Regions:
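Intrinsically disordered, metal-sensing/regulatory segments
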Residues: 1-250
Length: 250
């Protein structure tokens, strides 16, 4: 099995694992959730820089292309954030009879926001695989996203069930999110492999998208419940974990 297939299937499996855990763990304490997300944010931060942006600069003398790609990746995620509130209507779920339709609408917005971010996250993993040369940083993007997938998938299960969505449909939603991320992996891999000119741009784009997710979503979330110190040290530990892995191999 090729590395890109391992990456794609691994990301999908971690979403399903998180969803299954969500059926048994109804509510993960904020302290643990913030600590885990902080650790993941540290890995994602290091992976964005070492696994995507630095290789992008090394791949071309046209540094401005990389800068443009980074800003475009962040802007793309920003646009997704702006349009997310309008996309839940396409699911049709809000038209059905549930225990609490008002609650369901808010839950669907949350689920849709997670789902939409899985496409560019998958693309980032795919682009990093297209530049793979055996270094731990080649896998760091996929590992960071995979670790993030588990708690994210866990937290969408309980709200969906409480809003009246059936268990079968909840599992189907989780599976669909996993397929969306797999699609992103292959899109990113294809674009990154298309040409030497496209590779640094796509690496920068993926790096910008991951930095946006880390700064705009993951870090603020870990600081929202009073456990910012634990989350900060967890972030530092995650960042250093990747640096140590890179140093140990190289």
């Amino acid at each position: 099995m090729t590395p890109v297939w391992i990456s794609a299937l691994g990301l999908c499996v971690t979403i399903l694992v998180g969803a299954i855990l969500g059926f048994f763990i109804k509510e993960l304490p904020h302290k643990w959730n913030d600590t885990v997300l902080g650790y993941c944010a540290g890995i994602m931060l290091a992976a964005s820089i070492l696994g995507l942006i630095v290789p992008a600069f090394n791949a071309t003398a046209a540094w401005w292309l990389v800068v443009l790609g980074v800003m475009a990746g962040a802007a793309f995620l920003n646009v997704l954030d702006l349009i997310t509130p309008h996309l839940h209507h396409i699911t049709g779920l809000e038209q059905e009879e549930h225990l609490n339709n008002k609650t369901l609408n808010h839950v669907l917005l949350f689920v849709m926001a997670i789902a939409l971010h899985k496409l560019p996250e998958g693309m980032a993993a795919g682009v990093s695989m297209s530049n793979s040369c055996g270094s731990p940083t080649d896998w760091s993007v996929s590992v960071g996203i995979a670790l993030q997938n588990v708690p994210e998938a866990m937290v969408i299960i309980a709200p969906l069930l409480l809003a009246g969505v059936s268990k079968l449909r909840t599992v189907c939603i989780s599976f669909a999110i996993g397929l969306l991320e797999i699609t992103g992996v292959w899109i990113g891999y294809g674009l990154g492999s298309a040409s030497d000119t496209m590779l640094p741009v796509m690496l920068g784009f993926a790096g910008g998208a991951m930095l946006y997710v880390t700064s705009d979503e993951m870090i603020p979330e870990t600081h929202a419940h009073g456990y910012q110190k634990q989350a900060t040290y967890a972030l530092l530990l995650g960042f250093m974990t990747l640096l140590v892995m890179e140093k140990a191999v190289c």
